[in-house]
Design a protein with these regions (language model features):
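Short, polar/acidic, helix-capping and beta-turn segments at strand->helix junctions
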Residues: 1-136
C-alpha cells in the first residue's frame, strides 16, 4: 500500500494523503478546487469572516477536475483510468445543472460510475468535492 503525495494538487487540509495505491487500484481522498500554495478558492468571494458571499460553480468544477487530474498523473495514472467518482455538492438545486454539463465535457469518452450527493457543508468554503477510484 503506497501513499501518494501530489506536488501539483492543493495541500490536504488534514492528516491524509492525496491518494493510496493498493495493488492496481488508486483511491483518491476528497479533492476540492483550491489551488496549490494558495488560500484563495477559485470562483469564491468571501467576507472578512470567511463566509461565502458568492461562488461560481463552473469555475470550481473546472478547478477540481484539474486537481483530480494532477493527483492521477502524479500517481502514474490518468484521466481515462477513473472507474468511480463520488461528487459532493453543497447546493444540488442551484448547482447540479451546471456541474452536470461541465462533467459531461470532461467525461464524454471515459464514463466512470458516478454518484452525486448533496451535503450541508465541506471543511473549507467550497461548493464541490470529488472522491475518486482509478486504476494504475
Amino acid at each position: 500500500m503506497n501513499k501518494i503525495e501530489s506536488q501539483n494538487a492543493p495541500e490536504p487540509v488534514g492528516l491524509y494523503p492525496h491518494a493510496r495505491q493498493v495493488g492496481n487500484f488508486l483511491f483518491l481522498s476528497g479533492i476540492g478546487p483550491r489551488e496549490r500554495g494558495k488560500k484563495e478558492i477559485p470562483g469564491v468571494e468571501l467576507d472578512q469572516n470567511g463566509n461565502i458571499i458568492s461562488y461560481d460553480i463552473e469555475v470550481q468544477c473546472q478547478s477540481v477536475f484539474k486537481n483530480v487530474r494532477s493527483v492521477l498523473e502524479d500517481a502514474g495514472s490518468n484521466w481515462d483510468n477513473l472507474v468511480d467518482v463520488t461528487v459532493f455538492l453543497t447546493n444540488m438545486k442551484d448547482d447540479f445543472e451546471s456541474y452536470n454539463r461541465i462533467y459531461k465535457e470532461y467525461f464524454m469518452d471515459n464514463q466512470p460510475c458516478r454518484t452525486t450527493v448533496e451535503i450541508l457543508s465541506l471543511p473549507t468554503p467550497i461548493a464541490i468535492e470529488l472522491k475518486c477510484i482509478a486504476i494504475i
